[in-house]
A protein has these predicted regions:
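Terminal and domain-flanking low-complexity segments
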Residues: 1-23, 165, 172-199
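Intrinsically disordered, low-complexity acidic/polar segments
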Residues: 31-33, 39, 126, 178, ...
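Phosphoinositide-binding peripheral membrane targeting modules
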Residues: 62-176, 183-184
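Short, charged/polar low-complexity linear motifs in solvent-exposed/disordered segments
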Residues: 39-40, 137, 195-198
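Low-complexity, flexible helical/coil segments
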Residues: 57-61, 158, 188-191
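Anionic N-terminal interaction surfaces
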Residues: 1-110
Length: 199
């Protein structure tokens, strides 16, 4: 994996005078995630109930069971993060995993500057797209979420299950979220991000 190809898009996103100390391509850790932030109040007035809406309210809980999904995540993957609804980890997780994804492949990039932590997303690419689509997606990289350095309590890389390359970022509000890379990829970029956040 060539980490240098991500540096130019990140450099375009920082403010003038802001220095990039470390960056890494990573994925949010699999497993039990922090609770989602509270949803904003709906401004749409309630309408008439239809037979379809009543049936969906009856059948939808049978098709998906949130507690069952969370139990499978906890047993199979462990815990990917913790935090109350609206915490830093909760907002970060929601920024990277929205409730209604567009089903395109996006890369997550972590960048530590002398002022903040940037969590960036590349543009969307369809599965099995060509090299030109990947370059276009890289050019469409944008900041999905950011936090000042004062909001970061600590960061460290360590073992989780069989993967020795899991970055855990702890926030000052007590929440935390993990990021991983595939076992075949180098853990050096994650260690550099952890060192830059801890400095």
């Amino acid at each position: 994996m060539d980490e240098t190809r991500y540096r130019d898009p990140i450099d375009r996103l920082v403010e003038p005078g802001e220095r990039v100390l470390a960056h890494a391509k990573a994925d949010v850790g699999q497993g039990l995630a922090p609770a989602p932030p509270p949803e904003p109040e709906s401004t749409v007035a309630p309408g008439w109930r239809t037979v379809g809406s009543v049936l969906l309210n009856v059948l939808l809980p049978l098709a998906t069971w949130d507690r069952g999904d969370r139990l499978v995540d906890a047993i199979g993957w462990g815990i990917a993060g913790r935090g109350a609804p609206g915490s830093a980890a909760s907002r970060l997780h929601r920024a990277l995993r929205p409730p209604r994804p567009d089903l395109q492949v996006r890369e997550t990039l972590l960048a530590v500057t002398d002022r903040r932590l940037l969590v960036c997303r590349t543009g969307g690419v369809k599965l099995l797209a060509g090299r030109e689509a990947e370059e276009r997606a890289l050019a469409e990289t944008s900041v999905a979420w950011s936090a000042t350095r004062a909001e970061i309590a600590s960061a460290r890389v360590g073992w989780h299950r069989l993967n020795p390359k899991r970055l855990r970022i702890d926030f000052t509000d007590g929440s935390w979220l993990s990021f991983t890379v595939p076992i075949a990829d180098s853990g050096r970029p994650l260690r550099e991000v952890a060192a830059a956040l801890s400095a």
